Curated annotation (Swiss-Prot):
Protein name from the UniProt record: Elongation factor Tu
Main location: cytoplasm
Binding annotation for GTP: 19-26, 81-85, 136-139
Keywords assigned by UniProt, alphabetized: Cytoplasm, Elongation factor, GTP-binding, Hydrolase, Magnesium, Metal-binding, Nucleotide-binding, Protein biosynthesis
Database matches in Pfam families: GTP_EFTU, GTP_EFTU_D2, GTP_EFTU_D3
Alphabetized GO MF terms: GTP binding; GTPase activity; translation elongation factor activity
Catalyzed reactions per annotation: GTP + H2O = GDP + phosphate + H(+)
Broad class of enzyme this protein falls into: hydrolase
HAMAP family: EF_Tu_B
Matching CDD domains: EF_Tu, EFTU_II, EFTU_III
Region G2, annotated ranges: 60-64
UniProt source species: Thermotoga petrophila (strain ATCC BAA-488 / DSM 13995 / JCM 10881 / RKU-1)
């Protein structure tokens, strides 16, 4: 049986459910697929299937993630849901599954809880741009004023972390009631689900495609072709490149070299244009083989700068995950793998009151590399020591 072809007719958007444990994230995910399956726009994925999420590896870390897909009249959605709190943190930090918008699920019976706050903070730090709130379990609260109070608290919380708390769509409903409702899409219990989908279609803008962003390609390999010059190879991370385009070579020092790409090749054939996702070789004008190396990036002029010092949110692997067995303190010097660069760095700052970082923690830290590399906010990286991954991080602020 041939695999179904992915027909790209509708715009594609990545979303996910976030929020405190047992507030109904997976039930809501199941409810969405059930409702849309009745309209022929999804396959129903029951709760127990979502809850036993398969394992994935991202940057050397094992994460349990469920991916479901569904369509509305307007769009195609890929939706992620993680069963465990630690899985969310790992997913957000590694960027295993990135989100164009998140659905924050808050139980009306509890209101915002510690993990609600933690997920919102992380979403902000990893730049999940849009947030929609689903107040769940409203059938279990008799007094509507209590639900109003929960809504106020959630809007407040979002504002504290830089989301537009006053404008965020808030939908009230019961995910369980929708899952248990009869198979008639017009049934009352599905109304909040349709409201949520409308909010997603209208409030979360269509994301800018990677190919429309400024060109960037991490350099994986360098070789010289006699009589032609120096070729650098790698996978184009974003944007597009064609012969004649000016680029900058960035990283490993503060000096930025300008050059022109004179040819773009894929499988030894010349291309008119390379785009995001392509593995290509770029022939560089007037650059010797020893003037460029793995770990640098080729980028559109002015689009990214080399930096040594930055703040990052880092998840430190537990011993059971193959990480360190002992804590570390300020002054710890592991290797940082940033795109194709492998560079030693030092932990120069930890939050106030944090003396040591234990395996299993996630913590904001300040890092200083021994030489500058191309870095920007939202950049993911791995932390390694002695050939094994001991952590994963995301840049939250560039300092110098």
């Amino acid at each position: 049986m041939a695999k179904e072809k992915f027909v790209r007719t509708k715009p594609h958007v990545n979303v996910g459910t976030i929020g405190h444990i047992d507030h109904g994230k997976s039930t809501l995910t199941a409810a969405i697929t059930k409702y849309l399956s009745l309209k022929g726009l999804a396959q129903y994925v029951p709760y127990d299937q979502i809850d036993k999420a398969p394992e994935e590896k991202a940057r050397g870390i094992t994460i349990n993630i469920t991916h479901v897909e569904y369509q509305t009249e307007k769009r195609h959605y890929a939706h992620i849901d993680c069963p465990g709190h630690a899985d969310y943190i790992k997913n957000m930090i590694t960027g295993a599954a990135q989100m164009d918008g998140a659905i924050l699920v808050v139980a009306a019976t509890d209101g915002p809880m510690p993990q609600t706050r933690e997920h919102v903070l992380l979403a902000r730090q990893v730049e999940v741009p849009y947030m929609i709130v689903f107040i769940n379990k409203t059938d279990m609260v008799d007094d509507p004023e209590l639900i109003d109070l929960v809504e106020m608290e959630v809007r407040d919380l979002l504002s504290q972390y830089g989301y537009p708390g006053d404008e965020v769509p808030v939908i009230r409903g019961s995910a369980l009631k929708a899952v248990e409702a009869p198979n008639d899409p017009n049934h009352e219990a599905y109304k909040p689900i349709q409201e949520l989908l409308d909010a997603m279609d209208n409030y979360i803008p269509e994301p800018q495609r990677e190919v429309d962003k400024p060109f960037l390609m991490p350099i994986e390999d360098v070789f010289s072709i006699t009589g032609r010059g120096t070729v650098v190879t790698g996978r184009i991370e974003r944007g597009r490149i064609k012969p004649g385009d000016e680029v900058e070579i960035i990283g490993l020092s503060y000096e930025i070299r300008k050059t022109v790409v004179t040819s773009v090749e894929m499988f030894r054939k010349e291309l008119d244009e390379g785009i995001a996702g392509d593995n290509v070789g770029c022939l560089l004008r007037g650059i010797d083989k020893d003037e460029v190396e793995r770990g640098q990036v080729l980028a559109a002029p002015g689009s990214i700068k080399p930096h040594k010092r930055f703040k990052a949110q880092v998840y430190v692997l537990k011993k059971e995950e193959g990480g360190r067995h002992t804590p570390f303190t300020k002054g710890y010097k592991p290797q940082f793998y940033i795109r194709t660069a492998d560079v030693t760095g030092e932990i120069v700052g930890l939050p106030e009151g944090v003396e040591m970082v234990m395996p299993g923690d996630h913590v904001e830290m300040e890092i200083e590399l021994i030489y500058p590399v191309a870095i920007e906010k939202g950049q993911r990286f791995a932390v390694r020591e002695g050939g094994r991954t001991v952590g994963a991080g995301v840049v939250t602020e560039v300092i110098e």
